[in-house]
Amino acid sequence: MNISLGLVVICLLWQRDIRQWVTLAGHPLVWLPALMFVLLALSLLTHAHAYGPKMVGKYQKLLYVLPLALFFLAAPRLMTHFVRGFLWANAVILAISLTSGLGHVTLGGLNPDNPTVFKLQITQNVFMALAALVWLSRAFACSGKRRWGYAGLVLLATLNVLLMVQGRTGYVALAVGMGVWLLLTLRRKQQMAVLACGILAIVMLVMTPNRAMERLSLGVQQIQGCIWAPAETAYQACDNSMGQRTAFAREALRLIQQSPLLGNGAGSFWYGNPSTGYGVHNPHNEYLLETVQSGLLGLMVFLTWMWSCYRAAWRLPPAHRNLFVAVLSSYMACHLFNSFLLDSSEGHLFVIIAALLAGLSLNAQQPQRTSPQT
């Protein structure tokens, strides 16, 4: 990442139109994430946590918004290339995952019971949910065979997320993203029809044994078991996916009470068992992680960045607006269960999304600036 950042600086210096990158540097979508990084880096001067430098390094990706937005401004076709590449990659992953899950193929270490192809199951399910959302928007925009093709991809991706790959965060991304997009796109009567179909689908999922409901029920049981466990057996009772997230939240709230305004510094969160050597520095909740490390000040900067993303998305043409708002809403919901800005793949994807929004918002403002002169 350090080499990449150095190359980015060279590209910035090579950029001859100094006014363009100065304008971008003053854009809230660019300087707010940079401020988040600066707050985290400055905490190294006042707090000494062993994991602090590594945590700051993981958030270095927040500095990439400016150069990426410059690239998108210099060559708008890169936006199309990125979206196309994202969709093609997910289509290939979907094909391999379906082949493994339905055909019980174990080649290359694939597990038919959890056919994860790309990185971790959470990452694949979230990315597949976002791809399904884009395919859904294209199904509505196209006609004829292309509409049916995109509709088929939406159906297969939805089945893959809900019934095959074991990543509950993907359920959240899919439900929130599609729900927001349909709410913004459809007319009132169409919304009621989709709502009725959604309720029917939920009833069928609840009444019919399936992996999605099994995973959701297990998650609820894990949370309850962790909450009600006595102190002597609390660590063992919380030693599972949702139980650990519950324990993470408890520890995070304790740390926030110690230093609510400015936080405890980078790398201050830790949960584990010293006797076994197990420990994590990630509470799996971006809101809690920001508050623990940078305090309420850092949380406000983070939320202001998210609000600025929504504001920039809302000013785009309806088709782009609805899609970006839906994607942002998916991320906001998933931040409750994972620290997506900390995670590599999910964090880099959001940085690219922020850069896309920054580039599109400046492109939309340029005609307004030049119109008085003509």
Predicted regions and their residues:
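Hydrophobic transmembrane alpha-helices of multi-pass, membrane-embedded glycosylation machinery
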Residues: L5-L13, Y171-L183, C197-A201, W307, ...
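A membrane-periplasm/extracellular boundary helix in multi-pass inner-membrane enzymes
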Residues: T185-A234, R250-Q258
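Transmembrane alpha-helices of multi-pass inner-membrane enzymes
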Residues: G6-L12, F324-C334, L341-T374
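Transmembrane signal-anchor hairpin modules in multi-pass inner-membrane enzymes, especially those
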Residues: M1-L42, A50, A74-T80, R84, ...
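Hydrophobic transmembrane alpha-helices and their immediate junctions
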Residues: L183, Q190, Q293-S330
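Aromatic-anchored transmembrane helix interface
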Residues: P28-V38, A50-L73, H81, G85, ...
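Alpha-helical transmembrane segments of multi-pass inner-membrane proteins
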Residues: V9, L78-G109, K119-L186, V194, ...
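Long extracytoplasmic/lumenal interhelical loops at the membrane interface
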Residues: A234-S294
